């Protein structure tokens, strides 16, 4: 609910005028991460550039700009001990005005689901979300989409882009 509320903040507020450049946001992210890879590769991953080309050819039509956190997942929130609710979102240094689907994709990427087998890469981040009483990724994304009246048509693209950016940055060396 907090992420949907963030994405509903009007982007035409004067205070947000210098926060970001929403034009070609996704395209710039692809270019940025491929550039990082070209300049700072630690190991050879030639498939990454093929994937980058595919991403460039398949960028979804831009969504309406939104205020985005840039690193939204449970580890960047403060939760209530008494109730299942998020009290605050922290770690704002990547906040900008851009494509809100990037935030949703990152949240889903780090969200565990006890119903499925997960790769071990994010097991520590998924410790809370993998519990049996916690909503699934599908339910979580559906709740966000319903709150904002936005479709979830291209989530696989955005999740692919985020895994690509992680690989480009050699996050999992």
Regions found by a protein language model. Name each.
Residues 5, 54, 139-143:
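Amphipathic alpha-helical segments that form well-ordered structural scaffolds
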Residues 72-73, 164:
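Metal-dependent nucleic-acid phosphoesterase active-site entry motif
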Residues 154-160:
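Alpha-helical scaffolds flanking conserved acidic
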Residues 163-172:
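Single conserved hydrophobic/aromatic residue that forms the stacking wall/gate
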Residues 1-49, 53, 59-66, 94-100, ...:
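A cross-family kinase active-site recognition segment
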């Amino acid at each position: 609910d907090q992420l949907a509320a963030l994405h509903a903040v009007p982007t035409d507020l004067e205070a947000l005028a210098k926060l970001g450049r929403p034009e070609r946001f996704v395209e710039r992210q692809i270019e940025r991460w491929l550039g990082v890879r070209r300049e700072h590769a630690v190991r050879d991953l030639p498939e990454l550039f093929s994937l980058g080309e595919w991403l460039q050819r398949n960028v979804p039509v831009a969504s309406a700009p939104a205020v985005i956190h840039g690193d939204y997942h449970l580890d960047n929130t403060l939760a209530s001990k008494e109730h299942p609710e998020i009290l605050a979102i922290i770690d704002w240094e990547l906040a900008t005005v851009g494509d809100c689907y990037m935030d949703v994709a990152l949240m889903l990427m780090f969200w565990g689901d006890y119903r499925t087998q997960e790769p071990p890469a994010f097991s520590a981040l998924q410790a809370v979300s993998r519990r049996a009483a916690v909503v699934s990724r599908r339910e979580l994304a559906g709740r966000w989409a319903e709150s904002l009246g936005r479709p979830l048509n291209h989530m696989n693209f955005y999740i692919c882009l985020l895994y690509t950016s992680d690989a480009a940055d050699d996050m999992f060396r």
